[in-house]
Regions:
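Amphipathic alpha-helical "lid/sensor" segments that cap RecA-like P-loop NTPase cores
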Residues: 5-76, 138
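A short helix-turn-beta junction within AAA+ P-loop NTPase domains corresponding to the substrate/partner-engaging
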Residues: 1-2
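C-terminal leucine-rich, beta-strand-based interaction scaffolds used for sensing/assembly
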Residues: 26-29, 71-155
Length: 155
């Protein structure tokens, strides 16, 4: 269960206050909700912002920090995807594009993303799940690594 947003905000805000800065509650809440309260991703972004900014007042600052994080991880992601089949990589990008996919083997999803047939998607999905790159939630399939998800959306 994620930390309560207001408690987490107070914790992060305290660090910015200690160095004479400020963290906008609205901006923090956007980060919190974008990453579903997942501490690791939020902390990574907060650390980057703390290193580079005194006051956080707009989402554009967060976007710059996120871009920097993604660029730093790009070699890792590029190295990883070279081991995927074309079908696996296409499915990863399709799931990232849709954020969450309830029926990855549906004709609509396959056609919309120009994927191979349902059996190919099913086989690719199994491999991606086994490698813990795709995760099935109660709502549907998502890219497990939220930073990889953002990177896939950009390519």
């Amino acid at each position: 269960k994620p930390l309560d947003c207001s408690i987490y905000y107070d914790f992060c805000q305290n660090f910015f206050k200690q160095k004479g800065g400020n963290l906008s509650k609205d901006v923090f809440e956007q980060i919190y909700h974008q990453f579903n309260g997942h501490t690791w991703y939020i902390q990574c972004i907060m650390n980057r912002l703390y290193e580079t900014e005194l006051t956080i007042y707009c989402i554009e600052q967060v976007n710059v920090a996120l871009l920097s994080i993604l660029q730093g991880r790009e070699p890792q992601f590029e190295n990883m995807v070279q081991f995927f089949t074309e079908n696996q990589f296409a499915l990863l990008k399709a799931i990232a594009k849709d954020d969450i996919v309830t029926q990855p083997t549906s004709g609509k999803f396959i056609k919309e993303h120009k994927l191979s047939g349902a059996s190919s998607v099913k086989a690719a999905l199994k491999v991606l799940e086994d490698k813990e790159l795709v995760y099935r939630t109660n709502e549907g399939y998502i890219i497990y690594d939220r930073f990889m998800d953002l990177w896939l959306k950009r390519i």
